[in-house]
Amino acid sequence: SSTGDKDIVGYDWLMVDLDPTRPSGTSSSDAELEEAKNLGNKVYLALRNLGFEKPLFAYSGNGVHLLYKINLSNADERVALVKKCLQVLDMMFSTERVKVDTKNFNLSRICKLYGCKSAKGADTKDRPHRMSHIIGNPTEIKVTDIAYLEKLANLIPDEADKPQEYNSYSPSSFNVEEWMQKYGIQYKAVGCSDGTKYILDHCPFNENHKGKDAMVFRRNNGALSFVCLHDSCADKHWKEFRQFYEPNAYERREAVRQERMYHSFNRHMQPPQRAT
């Protein structure tokens, strides 16, 4: 029988696989491979800012690999953590032309042996077969502590804020695009694996943080998150982002919540009995 996840004792590596979008069964063009390398550099810089150690950097033949030494045991919560890290990287960095592979979380996943040829499809001038090889290897490969994996996973929480607008006592869905337009926030909307990514013109907390460094995410479940890739903004989340433009947003919501509770309580109160 083949080797399954249950047969593996743990993770040695977190493999971030950046794969160019191209016709099925074909090799990447030189331009597509260069785009994957450029995206790999962005992922590298962002994870270094987050506290990750230096990875092993390699060409797979058609895309780019960043391999981070992690040394995690085989446990359900560890698998869930690695899966979430790849999902967050996908939401943050995948483009229409290059995707972060989110399937590399399972323990029995195998990686290309560098030095082997990648021979997918016909070997043509525009889409040639290439040798996989290591681009960069740190002098000392250090283990990235689990705390930094958790930090990455928590950049986009599973249950982030779900703000609402209140009209009397009937809440309606919060329209984040209308809200950003109201406050003059410039953005570019891009679809991602679990909702929509809004790439901001700049971070409101530091206007020097620009060039896709600051983003708002709206997940399919309605949850909203704000992320700036710079370490100085690590403590800034959706709540702080919204309060930057709308300082009293959460105080108003709490006041409305208490008022609704008050009216609900009064409706269920029994009228006083008249004395006889």
Model-derived regions: residue spans:
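Signature for HUH/AEP ssDNA processing cores
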Residues: S1-N62, K69-M91, D158-E165, F174
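Flexible helix-coil linker/hinge segments at domain or subdomain boundaries
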Residues: Q87-D123, A160, F244-V256
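N-terminal nucleic-acid engagement/recognition segments and initiation subdomains in replication
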Residues: R257-T276
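Long, charge-rich alpha-helical interaction segments
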Residues: K125-S173
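N-terminal single-stranded DNA-binding subdomain of primase/primase-helicase replication proteins
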Residues: K188-F241
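Short beta-strand
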Residues: P55-N62, D101-N106, G191-S193, V216-R218
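Short secondary-structure junctions
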Residues: E53-L56, R97, K182-S193
